[in-house]
Amino acid sequence: MFRFIIILYLVFIKQGIGEEILFENFINNPQEKWEFISDQVMGGVSDGKVEYFKEDDKSYARMTGIVSLENNGGFIQIRKKIDFSLSKEIKSIKIQVRGNNQEYFIHIRTSGTILPWQYYQAPFIASDKWETQDIKLIEFKRSGIMLAKKINPKNIKSIAIVAYGKEHEAFIDVNNIIIY
């Protein structure tokens, strides 16, 4: 019985405490898990696409497109839903990216982001070489005062990579996404 309790503890309670969770490596049918979304859903004119590649030992998603501010637009994104509960001990998201030396964002939606324009966001630069960006959850800013000031990791419902907020050409490759 004691052994059974220890196993339950290790499997269910300890998950996420100091351990890395591979959220995505773009190997197993990523096209079935990731969704491309643009501001066209709200009348904008930004346009783009996501494609999946394998290069040497890396499988990755490539998001490309044109971000336009016309018609109150200004974003393209790829988003993946989380269909499991994260540990409240999660503190950070680590992503491996390369791109066109532009600023991009990670957007997190939670069970509290009910309206389509609600999210938490944190910026990063995608240089032209593969680099790992480590973004702490405390660095994410809420999109409005109606959201909680801090993200509760247990409430995270999706993670998105976003080209946002200014007119530019988006070109970003995303390899691994790790939550820890």
Regions found by a protein language model. Name each.
Residues 1-9:
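Sec-dependent signal peptide recognition
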Residues 4, 15-16:
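Positively charged, low-complexity intrinsically disordered regions
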